[in-house]
């Protein structure tokens, strides 16, 4: 049962909550927040909290800058790494204009609209995200270095794996915050880790991903480390992916359970994701560094699907019951989770609505170049991805024009900065490593 504003006010009063962080994302996925003294929370629920949208990248012009934050009480959680006395609560927010009309830059609202579209088709959507990250040492001033925490590899154990205790702290913390951790392990790269948490309804899954990323960053910092979700922080090592898993439920039945056939709703859904994969890339892989990851160290590059084959962009993992799903392996964690999940879902729903044809599965190892002959590839650069997305009828129908323009304008600035940097590595540290 969803929690109400009164439920949260009662909790605040009974549990010594002193501060409330109202959190949201800009259109590029960067988390922002304002902290309220707990006594201001009733006003926040009743009237919203005004803020200057012109100071948030991609939001508003200065001539009409006021926007209103509306906290979602069902997202309330206490930050477990803060003091037990004078506790700190966090809630995610939706954003409107002062007159109550929807704000086009409210990407959380966009995902809600796509979920509503799925519900109108009789579908419940569950989403699970697998998110990789690196742990780096910091210098004597607390600044991040490019020295990984350890030199362990995939599934290694201590002493090669030095991140085990920190992963345990992350799991315990996110569990307190309402996520359900399932397993964690050392990944392929030195200092690279993965913590997996259980799937959830689409909107909650996007909220959970933001919670996870902020928890990892905070817990790493408390341990004198720096956590990076940058797609390719070490150019000669594995990149950080964000594997997005989706399942569809109709009348209590998981549509991905059993054999996938081209004329099934699950088949049409996969066909829609494949049909729009190139158009989604500017959102799923939104920074120049994203393209150093694609096609290297087990990250996919070609638009294809298969059962279980990890070299494919889309695969159907071996599973049973409610765990049957489709997995999109191309995205990284640099993007806006509400746009990423919303657009992937919208692409799949478009496949169902238009009964798009499902290509034949590709049962080859696409990490061997000769095996990919004849297959369409994802864009090879952010500039190419912007061009594909900007010319897409699908994207034009899904996202407000103002949001598209600001999004692509910002990405074009990133391309220009990267391409003209005297030292691209220094530029990537400032605009990627230190912010993602």
Predicted regions and their residues:
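Glycine-rich, acidic/polar active-site loops that bind/position phosphate-bearing ligands
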Residues: 1-436
């Amino acid at each position: 049962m969803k929690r109400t504003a009164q439920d949260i006010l009662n909790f605040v009063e009974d549990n010594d909550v002193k501060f409330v962080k109202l959190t949201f994302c800009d259109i590029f996925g960067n988390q922002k927040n304002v902290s309220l003294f707990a006594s201001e929370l009733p006003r926040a629920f009743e009237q919203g909290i005004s803020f200057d949208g012109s100071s948030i990248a991609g939001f508003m012009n200065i001539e009409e800058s006021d926007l209103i934050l509306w906290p979602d009480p069902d997202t309330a959680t206490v930050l477990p790494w803060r003091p037990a006395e004078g506790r700190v609560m966090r809630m995610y927010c939706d954003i409107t204009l002062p007159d109550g009309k929807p704000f086009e830059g409210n990407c959380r609202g966009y995902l809600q609209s796509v979920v509503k579209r799925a519900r109108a088709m009789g579908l419940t959507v569950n989403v699970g995200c697998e998110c990789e990250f690196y742990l780096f040492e910091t210098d004597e001033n607390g600044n991040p270095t490019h020295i990984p925490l350890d030199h362990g590899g995939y599934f290694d154990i201590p002493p090669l794996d030095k991140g085990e205790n920190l992963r345990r702290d992350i799991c315990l913390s996110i569990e307190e915050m309402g996520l359900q951790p399932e397993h964690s392990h050392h990944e392929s790269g030195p200092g690279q880790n993965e913590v997996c948490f259980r799937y959830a309804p689409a909107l909650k899954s996007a909220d959970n991903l933001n919670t996870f990323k902020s928890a990892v960053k905070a817990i790493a910092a408390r341990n004198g480390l720096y956590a990076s979700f940058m797609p390719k922080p070490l150019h000669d090592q594995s990149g950080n992916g964000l594997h997005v898993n989706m399942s569809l439920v109709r009348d209590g039945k998981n549509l991905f359970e059993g054999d996938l056939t081209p004329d099934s709703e699950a088949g049409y859904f996969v066909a829609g994701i494949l049909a729009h994969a190139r158009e989604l890339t500017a959102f799923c892989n939104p920074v120049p560094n994203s393209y150093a990851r694609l096609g290297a160290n087990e990250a996919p590059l070609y638009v294809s699907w298969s059962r279980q084959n990890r070299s494919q962009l889309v695969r159907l993992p071996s599973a049973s019951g409610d765990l049957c799903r489709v997995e999109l392996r191309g995205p990284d964690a640099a993007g806006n989770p509400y746009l990423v999940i919303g657009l992937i879902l919208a692409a799949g729903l478009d496949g169902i609505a238009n009964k798009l044809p499902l290509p034949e599965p590709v049962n080859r190892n696409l990490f061997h170049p000769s095996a990919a002959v004849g297959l369409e590839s994802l864009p090879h650069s952010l500039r190419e991805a912007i061009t594909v997305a900007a010319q897409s009828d699908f994207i034009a129908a899904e996202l407000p024009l103002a949001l598209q323009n600001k999004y692509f304008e910002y990405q074009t600035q990133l391309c220009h900065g990267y391409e003209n940097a005297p030292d691209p590595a220094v530029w990537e540290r400032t605009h990627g490593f230190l912010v993602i």
